Amino acid sequence: MTNSFKLTATVSMLMACGLAQAATITLDGSNLTLDQAWEIARGDADVAIAPAALKHVEKSYQLVLEAAASGKPVYGLTVGVGLNKDKKLFTADGKLTPEVLQASREFNYNALRAHSAGIGEAMPETLARLAMVVRLNTLLTGRSGAQPRVAEIYRDFLNKHVTPVIPSEGTIGEADILLASHVGSVMIGEWRANYKGKLVSGKEALKAAGIQPLVPSGKDALAILSNNAVAVAYAIEAARNAQKVVQLTPTVYGLSLEGLNGNIAPILPQTIAARPFPNLKEAAAEMRDALKGSSLFDEDKSRALQDPLTFRVTVFGLAEAERAVKDLNDVLTVQINSSDDNPATLLDATEELRAESTRVDNYFIDGKEAKGAIIPSGNFNPLPVALALQRTSLAMAHLSHYAVQRTLHLSDDHFTGLSRFLTDPTNKGHAFGAIQKAYMAMHVENMSLANPVSLFGMPVAGDIEDTFTNLMLAAKNLNRIDRNTMQIYSLETLHATQAIDLRLVKTPDFKLSAPTKKLYDAFRKEVPYVKADRQFTDDIANGVKVLEAF
């Protein structure tokens, strides 16, 4: 997975013992790459906060205090949230008295508690950490209005391996408010967390890690709970897994085409030039590279003039899947380097329209310590990511479809000129006859999972929250499609390697390309030739391991 954003990492060395410490990745709110986020989530890198970014957070927090003192109605600060936006929390009258500050603290504590209402099993620890990485970086844009201590605790949780238990279900994709709130619950010393692999209470985790509990006020609770970082963590994982399947496709396809003794005509540059869709030229070149040096480039009068359609059009599926994954990575990179806060706390707000509109002017705060604007927004809506996920799911399902059909054809002696079901000549049993149901089952599930989900839902919260993206569901669906397609590719490779072995008996001088030979050899180390019927379950699982490591 590539990204053009600059890398801001520093690596220290333990010279005395000759061991390298984990890299320290410095977050500044604008330059985090997807690979860096994953590296931190896996515990392969520590986190530092860029001093300039923390100063920006401090200034933004000062703006929130100025707004609170002014008594202006600010969502989640001086008035409630959701349908309770019309309920005043306190009256400051220009002063942040102890009573005002206490009212703010009570609102924040209660908001974190009342919104901790998730369902299901806990998120995998790596994904929970990934969600915290994402939220920390978006906090550092300085647009949440949270106090700097919130950002520091996110950092400390990551570096000291305090991972709040976050339920894995209960979000409709307009900020993961019922899930992300569990992070805040641990910050205040409540709920539960994993500390260095051990499940403990939030209070125990903070004490063991040497972290002082957060005393939330102002916009702290809203900043912690109202964001999409939890669902985005699942989306990043799904994108990574889709990328792996896409990267494997040219070689898996190439090995199957060799097993078929198929025709390279559909991926020739002359053919592709006649219909220059985006990325099609590049995808065809990848397929040709995967077959370079193969006997398929040599004349063979026994070869069919035209192969079954799926062998001929997989190049289109690859081109579209690559585009979809790239677009998904692009929107995810924007998502993890920008604010999804509502309202947005803007130190850099332009004066545009302010003089012309009393409504716009009312959002501005001209305080003694900070100047800027706190403006209601719809930035919590992650529709670009949800749509990109669903497009990728559909593209991946097409790859799944092509692979299933190719595998079926490899079992058909009419197309291969080999034995039916790729049966060894001495085998009087089933060979690959029954196994077809396994990859068909995977593909049928993929067909279901590829259906759009972002329009499903009903208005909630007194009808004011009347839209949804189901971002987490879209991400989980793609992840499942990725997993299923990898299983299908394992089954296809099982068939392709068997076809190659049978073809080499028939045509000993048949040559594989270097890339397909590498895959063939890796697969054969774990999955032997099928001479007689055997249990195939372990073969399928071992094939997946080979492909994941390839």
Question: What label would you give each PLM region?
Answer:
Residues 23-45, 49-56, 60-68, 72, ...:
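C-terminal auxiliary extensions adjacent to catalytic cores
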Residues 1-21:
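Gram-negative bacterial Sec-dependent N-terminal signal peptides
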Residues 14, 136-137, 235-236:
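Short, Φ-rich (hydrophobic/aromatic) sequence segments
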